[in-house]
């Protein structure tokens, strides 16, 4: 840590811990949201591979997870989008747990969360304007990644 000079003394000293912003509460919330994102994405992944339709989140024609999860847009280069979600949230969870060990974590967390948000916004556009139906699980995942992106921005601004 850089040395600081106090106004009443010309002696250099280590900065006290209160001058360093603690982002731990933000990373804890990010970790909890990432676990929630893993759960939502895992349920969506299960629905992607399920043989039968369920009424789990098929509440109306306009809200039908099975239509979204079985559409041509439910895979990206042959990988289920929900599987990408599970992997992405797992990476975010890992970053949220190692944040004190690596100084680059806030930047990578923000970049990853923003990439996930852009992808989720694209998929939400497809739901609403191409498929003309909404997936409640997908909208939940969008809310989670938007929250993580916001927190990533807060964390990043506090570490500068």
What are these regions (language model features)?
Residues 2-160:
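Membrane-interfacial helix-loop segments of redox and metal-homeostasis proteins
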């Amino acid at each position: 840590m850089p040395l600081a000079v106090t106004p009443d003394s010309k002696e250099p000293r280590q900065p006290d811990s209160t001058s360093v912003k603690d982002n731990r509460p933000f990373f804890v919330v990010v970790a909890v949201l990432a676990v929630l994102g893993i759960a939502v994405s895992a349920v969506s992944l299960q629905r992607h591979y399920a043989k039968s339709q369920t009424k789990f989140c098929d509440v109306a024609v306009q809200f039908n997870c099975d239509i979204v999860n079985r559409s041509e847009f439910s895979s990206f280069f042959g990988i289920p989008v929900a599987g990408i979600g599970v992997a992405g949230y797992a990476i975010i969870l890992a970053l949220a747990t190692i944040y004190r060990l690596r100084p680059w974590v806030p930047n990578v967390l923000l970049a990853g969360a923003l990439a996930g948000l852009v992808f989720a916004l694209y998929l939400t556009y497809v739901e609403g304007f191409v498929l003309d139906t909404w997936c409640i699980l997908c909208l939940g995942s969008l809310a989670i990644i938007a929250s993580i992106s916001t927190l990533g921005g807060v964390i990043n601004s506090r570490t500068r």
